[in-house]
Amino acid sequence: MSNSQSKKIFGLIGKHVDYSWSPLIHNTGFEALGLPCVYTIFNIPSPEMIGDALKGSRALGIAGFSVTIPYKKTVVPFLDELSPEALSIGAVNTIVNDNGRLLGYNTDIDGFAAPLLPMAESIRNRPVCIFGNGGAALAAVEAFRLRFNPSSVLLVVRDTQKAEDMLEEYAYRDLVTIHAGREIDQPACSKLIRDCRVLVNATPVGTAGRNDHIHSILPTGHGLLHDGQIVYDMVYNPPETPLLAEARAAGATVIAGIEMLIAQAARAFSIWTGQELPVDLVRKTVLAAIEKSEG
């Protein structure tokens, strides 16, 4: 058997995910630790093909997957068991093939929480605010509930009905209040946001190559950013987003999206291999690759 044939195969399930940094992250870790593993990309064109893809993975002995949008919920019915975190929000981003049984995990929750943990005491019993109503926002809601015990979670969204639908089966719905983004101009809503200990951007606004701007969801002129806040942007490319630049200028503590990207990958890496991802090396490698891609 050749060396390539003896390697465990891991991969990313998604749609149009050739841009992903996940192969670089995991292959850097595998190589650094001398593990006989390789990570690749599995572009799946439609949700109707997910069941066949996972069935085939059992037969082929693929060791595990990462799962990204739009399939984090789609994969759930085809798995044999879910972790408590995955069950709580009905979404999976990590799969392990355990001798033909497919086990689903959600590492977005711990990945989101990781860079906030050193500031946990300052978050407890304080309100927090999340912009967005997709899976990333729900993972952030659950991370706050499980790890930080905030007094409340303010969800600021463009589509309030979509947010209501997302939270319909969430067991801790009473923790969350929903506001439409257009309400930010109203003094009462502005005050709620200013009083939040943490502000999170869980939308793709600010991502390199997009035409929109953070001011489309967080208008200026309301003093919403200040030095008593932690501002967390899940966008990781560019590493310093417009939101983070404005928050830094306002004196806020900032957390870049690359920290969540690497932390959730590190948790998946540990689930798959039982070893710790060399986080410092991976961060340096990914930042260098992002800088090169921008050049």
Curated annotation (Swiss-Prot):
It catalyses: shikimate + NADP(+) = 3-dehydroshikimate + NADPH + H(+). It holds the Pfam family Shikimate_dh_N. InterPro entries: Aminoacid_DH-like_N_sf, NAD(P)-bd_dom_sf, SDH_C, Shikimate_DH, Shikimate_DH-bd_N, Shikimate_DH_fam. It comes from the Bacteria. GO terms for molecular function: NADP binding; shikimate 3-dehydrogenase (NADP+) activity. Shikimate binds at S20, W21, S22, T68, N93, D108, Y236. GO terms for biological process: amino acid biosynthetic process; aromatic amino acid family biosynthetic process; chorismate biosynthetic process; shikimate metabolic process. Its EC number is 1.1.1.25. The active site is at K72. NCBIfam families: aroE. Involved in the biosynthesis of the chorismate, which leads to the biosynthesis of aromatic amino acids. Catalyzes the reversible NADPH linked reduction of 3-dehydroshikimate (DHSA) to yield shikimate (SA). PANTHER family: BIFUNCTIONAL 3-DEHYDROQUINATE DEHYDRATASE_SHIKIMATE DEHYDROGENASE, CHLOROPLASTIC, SHIKIMATE DEHYDROGENASE. This is Shikimate dehydrogenase (NADP(+)). It comes from Chlorobaculum tepidum (strain ATCC 49652 / DSM 12025 / NBRC 103806 / TLS) (Chlorobium tepidum).
